[in-house]
């Protein structure tokens, strides 16, 4: 097996390992979808997870009591799963926490019934030296397609945007006039991050956050959509953030290389020592990654200057945190 074949298979395998194990039986749908499933999150709005008959191939995370929003509108966050999995509850801890801070989050894929608890994730890596230089990826030859077809498609991100826009305009919808369709983030982990990159150039998108992911050095259709190359990054004109684990994260170098390639837009790159490709998503309330996600979204979608302090300036919150390594470009 060549190094490249091993690398592609490993990305797929590790991404799956980061997810809970499912029975993949699906959830029977009724008109309006199954009853919302109680979750919570650490934010001011108790969040729930549900499916909607108008968007059957997705999972919706929202504040439980929409009537209590009192004129508050929810920015929209669309999520692509690791391994491009067709399971919208595979990152439920993480997305519930984000929604609890006043966001409408929509994941690709329906709710599927959970089986046994997932694996604990990759072991902690040795702590690397402080502020190591960013290294380029070693995969410099063309990547063959060595994966089964992605179970979700980047077009489902656009479907979610259209659905949320329609529900915001539809009298009688619980989302009527409660969605800020002018503030939209696309995000995803691993393979789902590639899906987010593909649609980040859409004019409706406000920001993109790429988790444990990045494009390959050579063109690849890993996300199930079009074949993407680094040049596709030039079509993106909104602020981006790349968040990953350390060098044990199989996509660490991919994220580094994307950061180096991007020239003109604001881009934030950070990775956490001792964390691998599985991130902290399955920890209570999504762990530290969720807190970072909430802060970035509060800044980019709500204009929260206090949240910006986590990312902006030489003494930014993550910059002075010894667990994190940070690089930025054009970030103001």
PLM feature segments, named:
Residues 29-72:
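N-terminal cap/lid segment of alpha/beta-hydrolase-fold proteins
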Residues 89-112:
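Short amphipathic alpha-helix adjacent to the substrate-entry channel of hydrolases
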Residues 124-181:
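Alpha/beta-hydrolase active-site loop
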Residues 161-235:
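Primarily recognizes the serine-hydrolase "nucleophile elbow" in alpha/beta-hydrolase
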Residues 206-283:
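The feature captures the conserved acid-bearing segment of alpha/beta-hydrolase catalytic domains
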Residues 265, 274-276, 283-332:
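Alpha/beta-hydrolase-fold serine-hydrolase catalytic core, especially in secreted/extracellular enzymes
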């Amino acid at each position: 097996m060549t190094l490249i074949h091993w690398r592609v298979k490993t990305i797929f395998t590790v991404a799956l390992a980061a997810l809970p194990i499912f029975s993949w039986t699906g959830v029977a749908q009724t008109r309006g979808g199954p009853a919302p499933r109680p979750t919570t999150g650490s934010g001011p709005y108790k969040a729930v997870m549900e499916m909607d008959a108008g968007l059957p191939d997705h999972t919706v995370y929202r504040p439980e009591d929409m009537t209590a929003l009192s004129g508050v509108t929810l920015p929209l966050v669309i999520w692509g799963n690791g391994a491009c999995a067709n399971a919208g509850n595979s990152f439920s801890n993480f997305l519930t926490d984000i929604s609890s801070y006043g966001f409408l989050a929509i994941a690709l894929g329906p709710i599927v019934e959970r089986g046994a608890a997932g694996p604990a994730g990759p072991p902690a890596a040795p702590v690397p030296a402080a502020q190591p230089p960013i290294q380029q990826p070693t995969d410099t030859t063309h990547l063959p397609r060595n994966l089964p077809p992605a179970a979700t498609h980047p077009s489902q991100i656009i479907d979610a945007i259209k659905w949320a826009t329609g529900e915001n305009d539809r009298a009688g919808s619980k989302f009527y006039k409660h969605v800020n369709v002018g503030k939209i983030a696309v995000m995803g982990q691993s393979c789902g991050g590639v899906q987010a990159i593909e649609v980040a150039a859409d004019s409706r998108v406000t920001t993109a956050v790429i988790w444990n992911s990045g494009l390959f050095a050579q063109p690849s259709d890993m996300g199930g959509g079009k074949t993407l190359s680094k040049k596709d990054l030039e079509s993106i004109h909104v602020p981006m953030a790349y968040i990953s684990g350390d060098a044990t994260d199989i996509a660490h170098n991919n994220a580094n290389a994307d950061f180096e390639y991007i020239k003109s837009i604001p881009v934030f790159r950070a990775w956490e020592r001792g964390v691998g490709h599985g991130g902290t998503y399955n920890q209570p309330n999504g762990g530290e990654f969720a807190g970072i996600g909430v802060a970035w979204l509060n800044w980019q979608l709500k204009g929260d200057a206090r949240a910006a302090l986590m990312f902006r300036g030489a003494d930014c919150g993550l910059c002075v945190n010894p667990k994190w390594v940070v690089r930025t470009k054009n970030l103001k």
